[in-house]
Amino acid sequence: MIQRNSTFIIDELKSNNYTIDTVYDIGANKGEWTKEWKRNLPQANFYLFEANPSIKLKGNFFNSVLSDEDDKDVKFYLPNMSNSYPTGASYYKEASVYYSQDRYIDVKTKKLDTLINDNSLPLPDFIKLDTQGSEPDILKGATEALKECKVITCEMPIMPYNENAPDFSECIKILKDNEFIPSGCDKIDAKTKGIFNQIDIVFVKRNILEKIHNFSSFYKGY
């Protein structure tokens, strides 16, 4: 079990008087992550974002294909009809047997910043991002949202898992450019056919991590 995961890090921030009032679950699927975190953060307001049009949830839910541009036409790939695979839908087609039938719908994208402005949403303190390869694109379209954010947990590819999707280094660079530093890990996905293909990394805003740990007195890499 990974000790320094998002639960540990959120507790660390709370013990240092940082508040987590607004949480964005981007790539919410059926809302399981939010259900779990509502137990950890009962006072917080959760906002769920899911691109798959077949999924409808109650509450603060937005069915939108987030990206780095508004009104960009993209193909949104869906799993094969012959299986009940619950996740993986994306405008970057998953490179697996579950997506061999090339099923897709035509959709238009929206920047997270635009959606926030259009709906007068509060800016997030904590973001979970799991969107099957489009995470870097969404971050590029969220420059205003990231200004107030304290923690991001983001799924990142180790091996190419979605066709033509940005790679690990690009995601790290975008987050670094927005003053986020890797601080922990939620999950290592190495269970499918012996391949280590994905990792969920927890990032913390640089100034917060510096205030709590004074990391720059030791580590000069960031």
List each language-model region with its residue ranges.
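Phosphate/nucleotide-binding beta-alpha loop and adjacent structural elements of enzyme active sites
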Residues: 1-222
